[in-house]
Every structure is written in structure tokens, then in C-alpha cells.
């Protein structure tokens, strides 16, 4: 009986993380397909596939902000991002639910790409950006916001998880070619979105 309960609990945990699992699968599939069709370390190839490159993105190819979120330059790049996505994504998805979690992830990633574009345009740097790290930093911001402002414990974020989120963020950002502007943009977006979600839900509960 106890083993059955454990297995059922494990299945429930995975079902509660279905969006995180889907995002990981999507990133891995994109990586495999692009690796088979060309050289993912080649910036020109990655631009052709949809990487974020500000001269093109800010000229109207805004779809690159989305496609670049699922592209990676190496297996190490993919692996470090997916480990962090699983670790932090499960926390945020359990707290916010599938819809709000996906909204937080996507808006953080899009914001990260946009901030990266404007920053590199200002400094006139021809940087090709790709990867899930901007969105993942958004999850770090979300965890921080919920840990700080959810005083009633409505979303069940354990404040002891914040250092772990910071640690995974550091692991994501240790690569020499890290896009700091994107990470800052994603972090700020995730923090703000979760803060707004918390405030709206708290306000609605108070009015009722």
C-alpha cells in the first residue's frame, strides 16, 4: 500500500509539472533537429534558424524573440539550461499553476530578448543571442517575488528555496559568452509578473 501511494504521489508531481516537461522536450527536440541539419556553433546558421540578432529583430523580425528561446549553441549550453529549468520550473509551476507559470516563462523570455536587443543596439555590438536562460532567470525573479511578498503563504514558496534558485542562476550564467542584458531583463520581468499576480489575487480575495 505504501509503495502504491509513493508511486501515485510521484505521478502527481510530474502531472503538476507538465508545462515544465513540455518546455524541456521542446528545447531538446529543437536542439536535435538543428544539430542534425547544420553547425549550431555557427552564428550565421543560428541566425538563419531564428536566433535573436538585433539588426534583424528590431527591423521587424520580432518572431526571433520567441524562436531564440528554444535554441542553444552547444550540448553544454542546453544541459545547463534544462537542469535549471527543471529545478526552478517545477517550483514556480507548482506555485502559480500551469497557465500563470507559462505566462511568466514566456513573457520573461520575450522581455529578456528585447532588452538584449536594445542594449546591444546601444553599444553597437553584433551579438547573436539564443537560449532559454532569459526565461529561466525570469523564474528566479518569480521565486524571489513570491518568497518576499507572499506573506500569507498562499503560493507555498519556501523561502529556503531562494538560495537554491540563486545558485542555479549562477550556474546558468557562468558561461563566458553569457548575455547579461538578457538575464537582467528576464529576472526583472519574472519578478514583476509574479508580484502583479500576487497583488491581483490578494486584492480579489480581499474584495470577496
Model-derived features: where do they sit?
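A detector for small-residue-rich transmembrane helices and their helix-helix packing motifs
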Residues: 2-208
Amino acid at each position: 500500500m505504501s509503495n502504491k501511494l509513493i508511486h501515485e504521489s510521484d505521478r502527481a508531481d510530474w502531472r503538476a509539472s507538465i508545462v515544465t516537461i513540455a518546455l524541456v522536450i521542446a528545447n531538446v527536440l529543437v536542439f536535435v533537429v538543428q544539430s542534425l541539419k547544420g553547425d549550431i556553433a555557427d552564428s550565421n546558421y543560428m541566425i538563419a534558424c531564428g536566433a535573436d540578432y538585433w539588426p534583424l529583430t528590431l527591423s521587424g523580425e520580432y518572431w526571433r524573440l520567441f524562436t531564440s528561446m528554444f535554441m542553444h549553441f552547444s550540448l553544454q549550453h542546453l544541459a545547463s539550461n534544462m537542469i535549471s529549468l527543471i529545478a526552478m520550473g517545477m517550483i514556480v509551476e507548482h506555485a502559480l499553476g500551469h497557465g500563470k507559470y507559462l505566462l511568466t516563462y514566456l513573457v520573461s523570455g520575450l522581455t529578456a530578448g528585447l532588452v538584449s536587443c536594445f542594449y546591444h543596439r546601444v553599444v553597437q555590438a553584433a551579438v547573436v543571442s539564443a537560449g532559454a536562460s532569459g526565461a529561466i532567470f525570469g523564474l528566479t525573479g518569480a521565486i524571489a517575488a513570491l518568497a518576499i511578498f507572499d506573506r500569507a503563504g498562499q503560493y507555498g514558496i519556501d523561502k529556503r528555496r531562494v538560495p537554491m534558485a540563486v545558485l542555479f542562476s549562477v550556474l546558468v550564467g557562468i558561461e563566458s559568452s553569457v548575455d547579461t542584458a538578457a538575464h537582467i531583463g528576464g529576472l526583472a520581468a519574472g519578478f514583476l509578473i509574479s508580484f502583479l499576480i500576487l497583488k491581483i489575487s490578494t486584492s480579489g480575495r480581499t474584495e470577496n
